[in-house]
């Protein structure tokens, strides 16, 4: 029998060493023990996979950019090599995303009871995120499917968060941040993105007195990111120049 506490300890250690693949493997094993995760364990799982998938997302963007330049140069041999490398990174990214989505569907979301609104929103947001990461690299029918799944997860999380969580809650704010990025980057719907981000920001500002001392820093940081994205997106709509979105 694997010692749960030892696995969690290993994940903490791996995080300090910035060995995120090890961290993810440890937290995957914890999740597969099929017991509810504590807030700390939930965050360890999230941080581990965010870094594992983040490295692949970053690599994919770099290689895609090189692929476009190589295509313009017309160097067939180099083009073939770059394409093959992009596809290799894509496969890695897809494997990581499918791993997370399996954990969410088979254990984490499934085991949330009717009163665990915070956990349910956290996991549904995560599900929306990992389908969004798949949508970033998918094309054709495959893309349509993952976009639909992402939208469905975000939408369900959004409804629960509006009904059961304070507008200043960092999980509700983080969901609004990522859901609005989904509208802007994946759905190419800047008006919906701006509306969602602005509503979340304004609702939180209106209830600043409900800010929990423990989560004050998290909440205000996400509010700042929402505002930064709004500023970027509204200026983009005015001059149509791209920029780097916070997500």
From Swiss-Prot:
- Entries under InterPro entries matching the protein: 14-3-3, 14-3-3_CS, 14-3-3_dom_sf, 14-3-3_domain
List the residues marked with site Interaction with phosphoserine on interacting protein.
Answer: 57, 132
Q: What does this protein do?
A: Adapter protein implicated in the regulation of a large spectrum of both general and specialized signaling pathways. Binds to a large number of partners, usually by recognition of a phosphoserine or phosphothreonine motif. Binding generally results in the modulation of the activity of the binding partner.
Q: Give the UniProt subcellular location, in the record's own words.
A: Cytoplasm
Q: What does the sequence similarity comment in the record state about its family?
A: Belongs to the 14-3-3 family.
Source species of the chain: Oncorhynchus mykiss (Rainbow trout)
Coiled coil where?
none
Cytoplasm: present as a keyword of the record? yes
Tell me a GO cellular component.
cytoplasm
Oligomeric state and interaction partners are given as: Homodimer, and heterodimer with other family members.
Pfam families tied to this protein: 14-3-3 (PF00244)
Provide the tissue specificity: Expressed in brain, gill, heart, intestine, kidney, liver, ovary, skeletal muscle, spleen and testis.
Its main localization is cytoplasm
Q: What keywords is this UniProt entry annotated with?
A: Cytoplasm
The protein's induction, as recorded, is: Repressed under stress conditions such as netting.
Name of the protein in question = 14-3-3 protein gamma-1
